[in-house]
Amino acid sequence: TYVEAFPNENDTQTIFDYVFCGNYQPSLRNSLTLKLMRDILQNRVLSILRERENIVYSPYASLFYNGLPQQVFYFDLSASVDWGNTKKVEGLIKEIIHELRTHKVSEEELDAMKKSFLLTKQKVLSNEASAEWRTNLVNLLKNGETIDDFEQYEKFLSSISTTDIRKAFKELVNPDKFVLLYIGKHQKYNE
């Protein structure tokens, strides 16, 4: 775990980024798995930290990955929180990841995400969208994915199971190994 703090003129608010990084084997299936994991994290951050606990503002889960040559990825969970809840937020983020490492997500949740991926692909990569196609093809090659695999996008996406997602969280994301960047104060690290 690495922690870096930055000053904030607002004494009551802390803006944080919990970054969980690792390595992965580049392939379209693995990239899709990472993207599904990102969306699951986004759902959990919203439903638990924002809706249930009501302690964060503007929560967001991002995914950055680079297949070639580094084979690295990272998830960035970011939000703003009253500094008095910073310790609680960290505990809840660790609980969310632990839960995803040990329990499968529901078939319904995963199926809804897969459907969303297919709709987005159809909408963005239409016959008239040459710039989007070019960008997509460059990104495929840059990330160690093949055009042949992309032609089987639906097959790869549908092959990802709830067990695969749980296994990926277990193998790729450790709740105790993260980078924390924050602007403001943190109860745990400013004691």
Task: Please place each PLM-identified region on the residue numbering.
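Bilobed periplasmic-binding protein-like "clamshell/Venus-flytrap" ligand-binding domains
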Residues: 164-184
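Helical mechanochemical/support elements of P-loop NTPase systems and associated helical scaffolds
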Residues: 45, 161-164
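M16 family metallopeptidases and their MPP-like homologs
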Residues: 11-29, 50-159, 177-185
